[in-house]
């Protein structure tokens, strides 16, 4: 299984003081040595990663670069110019802390944007909710890759197997008894497996990501149809204590098959 390391949260730390430290390019070099892919989300408001980050990483790093972006003309034109290995199209809301759900596949610009990226020999992935309907639509839209949103799975795992329900970070909608949460968790994991199988049957390559960490990743790794995970915040958080290289290697060990 391949590991794409999302380095957005290193950019978050840099932007907190609006200086050039930590150096995102240095982080990209470490990911290039120890991970399989560099993933970077350039948002419409440029709150974290900047255009020059993407340009430098593509120019100086040998690893594949997976650009996450919304259906924004300015950023899509940047992608067409710089030509990352892959563009993963994601939904985006300015007020959100992180990507909250999968992409709406009925967007009028989506088909045209995919065609433009394909014409530039850029692989296209769609970040989607784990639903059979969205997988079938992704195939019709001629995406090569889908990335299944694992946020709900991760939230359920957190509610079941951590103390988050007793903290300020508890999710009100998951304030339920353990038996109910366990049933929902098992159902969501089964749904991820079903969706991954459907994607592979349709000839799509299947990735997964969002909220995955060192404690919840193992059940997802067992879904053999998933070939790649994109993980960011948990690896960067771990790197504060272990260093980025070790944090990546620890995750690589966990996702070995």
From Swiss-Prot:
Q: Which GO terms describe its cellular component?
A: cytosol
Tell me the pathway: Cofactor biosynthesis; pyridoxine 5'-phosphate biosynthesis; pyridoxine 5'-phosphate from D-erythrose 4-phosphate: step 5/5
Q: Which GO terms describe its biological process?
A: pyridoxine biosynthetic process
Question: Which residues constitute the catalytic centre?
Answer: 41 (proton acceptor), 68 (proton acceptor), 210 (proton donor)
**What are the subcellular locations of this protein?**
Cytoplasm
Q: What molecular functions are annotated in GO for this chain?
A: pyridoxine 5'-phosphate synthase activity
Q: Which reaction does it catalyse?
A: 3-amino-2-oxopropyl phosphate + 1-deoxy-D-xylulose 5-phosphate = pyridoxine 5'-phosphate + phosphate + 2 H2O + H(+)
The answer to whether keyword Secreted applies is no
Q: Which NCBIfam families match?
A: pdxJ, PRK05265.1-3, PRK05265.1-5
UniProt lists the family membership as follows: Belongs to the PNP synthase family.
What is known about its subunit structure? Homooctamer; tetramer of dimers.
Cited PANTHER family: PYRIDOXINE 5'-PHOSPHATE SYNTHASE
What is this protein's name?
Pyridoxine 5'-phosphate synthase
Q: What's the name of its gene?
A: pdxJ
């Amino acid at each position: 299984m391949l590991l794409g390391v999302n380095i957005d949260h290193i950019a978050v730390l840099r932007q907190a003081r609006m200086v050039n430290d930590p150096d995102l390019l240095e982080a990209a070099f470490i990911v290039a040595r120890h991970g399989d892919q560099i993933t970077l989300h350039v948002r419409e408001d440029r709150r974290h990663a900047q255009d020059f980050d993407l340009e430098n990483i593509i120019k100086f790093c040998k690893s594949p670069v997976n650009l996450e972006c919304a259906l924004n003309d300015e950023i899509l034109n940047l992608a067409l110019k710089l030509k990352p290995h892959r563009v993963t199209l994601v939904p985006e809301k300015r007020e959100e802390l992180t990507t909250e759900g999968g992409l709406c596949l009925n967007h009028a610009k989506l088909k045209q944007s995919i065609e433009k990226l394909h014409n530039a020999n850029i692989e296209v992935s769609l970040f989607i909710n784990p639903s059979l309907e969205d997988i079938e639509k992704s195939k019709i839209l001629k995406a090569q890759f889908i990335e299944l949103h694992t946020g709900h799975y991760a939230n359920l795992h957190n509610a079941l197997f951590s103390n988050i329900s007793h903290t300020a970070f508890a999710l009100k909608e998951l304030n339920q008894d353990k038996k109910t949460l366990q049933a929902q968790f098992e159902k969501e994991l089964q749904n991820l497996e079903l969706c991954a199988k459907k994607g592979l049957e349709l000839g799509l390559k299947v990735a997964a990501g969002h909220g995955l960490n060192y404690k919840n990743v193992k059940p997802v790794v067992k879904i053999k149809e998933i070939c790649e995970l994109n993980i960011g915040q948990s690896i960067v958080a771990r790197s504060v204590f272990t260093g980025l290289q070790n944090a990546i290697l620890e995750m690589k060990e966990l996702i070995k098959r």
